[in-house]
Amino acid sequence: MENIQVLKLHPAARIPERATASSTGFDLYACIESPIELKESPQLISVGIALSIPFGIDAQIRPRSGLTLKGIMAGYGTIDADYRGELFVTMYLLDNDSPYVVRSGDRIAQLVFNSTPLVNIDLVHSIDDLGSTDRNSGGHGSTGR
């Protein structure tokens, strides 16, 4: 098991927490001076922390399913192992018919850690250089419902 170092950048910041012992994601909490009313246009919401992530691991910010069900979106984001700045979550509403206000301490997203191999990109010059698979170029629902 890897350890992730967390620095609280603001006194009111909360350390990410698992909701249950088996939870994959850690809840991220808003750390803002005053409430923010979400709109359809994206807004950055501070989490008030910075991380030290070991190389070979990345962190992903993901939406919380309960908020998504209400049309409150947290944009996906990747935090690379070499990033040491403050974490923010991009949030927006699917429509303005259901106003939503974010307050400091609200759970706004999840943080999920993954092993990430470091890879190189090699340029090839024909489709045949990529090799063949059963699927080949089939996409966008080509494997069925």
Residue locations for each model-derived region?
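DUTPase catalytic domain/fold
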Residues: M1-R145
